[in-house]
Amino acid sequence: MGKRLISQNRGRGTPKYRSPSHKRKGEVKYRSYDEMEKVGKVLGTVIDVLHDPGRSAPVAKVRFANGEERLVLIPEGISVGEQIECGISAEIKPGNVLPLGEIPEGIPVYNIETIPGDGGKLVRAGGCYAHVVAHDIGKTIVKLPSGYAKVLNPACRATIGVVAGGGRKEKPFVKAGKKHHSLSAKAVAWPKVRGVAMNAVDHPYGGGRHQHLGKPSSVSRNTSPGRKVGHIASRRT
């Protein structure tokens, strides 16, 4: 009998395939959507900028006027000591948090809520931004980085600007060790070995005098887990 496939091993949930979330700095989300933000604004000061393992963008520690501290995603151009505003009457400038309904059309935004008060769900990767496209009664249309136009509640909050860390892809890894350390902070099994390059005991496509499948690549949806590789329940190949 052969060894278990990676897909079978992954289902067991060993540390190798788990996201090392214990290394992260903490929860990165907006402060609670209270009355202070709904009728006015809350001032906060950036007291530190941190690297968060497993995240493509830096995070800032912000201390608000009421003494509350939060980790937030910062835009390009924000540094330690600068002030940010959160609320319906906040100024339209990078780093400030406002409801979508109060943001003019064409302004780049990020960390967008899908439900008012959820803390931010969309457009959070380094260098990403969305655009406010249009406003209507009871809805705001936002164009996401994928090009999809999403209709959202105008009370959903977003941050003005472009997420910091956008130039990270321009610098090559150069060494395999750098790639290893980068992906070890995420739930990514790397390097990824091809099935035909394995031994017969490790994979259905392994073994042989040269690298070839040796069997049809299409398999049934109901086939056994140890054979379910290739084109699974394919309509065509």
Curated annotation (Swiss-Prot):
GO terms for cellular component: cytosolic large ribosomal subunit. PROSITE patterns: RIBOSOMAL_L2. It holds the Pfam family Ribosomal_L2. Residues 1-26, 204-237 are annotated as: Disordered. Keywords: Ribonucleoprotein, Ribosomal protein, RNA-binding, rRNA-binding. Residues 13-26, 228-237 have a biased composition (Basic residues). Residues 1-11 have a biased composition (Polar residues). One of the primary rRNA binding proteins. Required for association of the 30S and 50S subunits to form the 70S ribosome, for tRNA binding and peptide bond formation. It has been suggested to have peptidyltransferase activity; this is somewhat controversial. Makes several contacts with the 16S rRNA in the 70S ribosome. This is Large ribosomal subunit protein uL2. It comes from Methanococcus vannielii. The lineage of its organism: Archaea, Methanobacteriati, Methanobacteriota, Methanomada group, Methanococci.
